[in-house]
Amino acid sequence: MDELHFCPKCGEETLNWDGEKKLSCNQCSFVLYHNCAAAVAVVIRCGNEIMLTKRSQEPGKGKLDLAGGFTDPKESAEEACARELKEELDIEIIPENLKILLTLPNIYRYKDIDYNTLDIFFEYHVDKKFDAKLDISEVSEIAWIYENEIDLNEIAFNSQKKFFQKYLNRNQ
């Protein structure tokens, strides 16, 4: 956010970033808050296996990820889960069967801008493993991995690593 200098209201080069969440103009008192964006991630389970995706774009290209993404305006977290799973994997779910597990803060760096996110983790059970029709612009492949074989070093995002540390140790 340090790269933004010109005020969108008055046009002067007087825009200042407070280092955390706010841009403000010294000239006209314009204020723009850079609030948290909501994002969803879905643990799709079949027995003791979890479906993970491999990212085909930055950030975290080539790393493992849970299916999900950002919520759209006027969309519930459950609706975002259903939309993202349809977009990324071409599967349809019953949103009422999602179980919310945990929320964690995260920083999502995109094109040299850090976006603060609140990642909302859900669980969704399926009776049998499935093949997905992938949106290769987002997902290069899927893998069904036994939960005790998940390597946290291969997970793309810190919030998901923290999530899996808690999730995988939930019964201990």
What are these regions (language model features)?
Residues 17, 92-102:
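A short coil-to-beta-strand element that immediately follows conserved catalytic motifs
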